[in-house]
């Protein structure tokens, strides 16, 4: 069984206000084990990255100025994820941003099965604090 662990970084929190994807990272799993196959790319955007977002991911407009736009990596991304299940922490956020980028390109929304690890972590840990930084510290 093939699954893809996926994460994005963005210019801000609201795609409806024009925020965009600036980084995508994917890791392939077969039967829940990493194969070592990954896909990672940065995206140039004209939108200014929010200061709060920079504090989270450290990516700046200056760094991204030499990167291609999402459009140039979209097919490579879709070929990598295929129709396999996507494992995403706080999936609504990432999926909405990805679908927004795909929509800008005239492509259909993702149809992949989505496994959201955020509610799983909250249930397992019996805690509202379950962002990725916390989980990484908790599980080393």
Where are these regions (language model features)?
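Conserved non-catalytic scaffold segment of RNase H-like nuclease domains
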Residues: 1-112, 125-140
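A generic structural signal for short hydrophobic patches within well-formed alpha-helices
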Residues: 120-121
């Amino acid at each position: 069984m093939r699954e893809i662990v996926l994460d994005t970084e963005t210019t801000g929190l609201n795609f409806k206000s024009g925020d965009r994807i600036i980084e995508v990272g994917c890791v392939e799993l077969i039967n829940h084990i990493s194969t070592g196959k990954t896909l990672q790319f940065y995206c140039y955007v004209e939108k200014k990255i929010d200061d709060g977002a920079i504090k989270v991911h450290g990516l700046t407009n200056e760094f991204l100025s030499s990167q291609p736009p999402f459009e140039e990596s979209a097919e490579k991304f879709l070929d990598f994820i295929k129709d396999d299940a996507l494992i995403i922490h706080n999936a609504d956020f990432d999926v909405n941003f990805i679908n927004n980028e795909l929509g800008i390109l005239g492509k259909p929304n993702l149809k992949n099965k989505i496994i959201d690890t955020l509610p799983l972590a909250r249930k397992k840990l019996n805690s509202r604090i379950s962002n990725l930084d916390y989980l990484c510290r908790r599980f080393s």
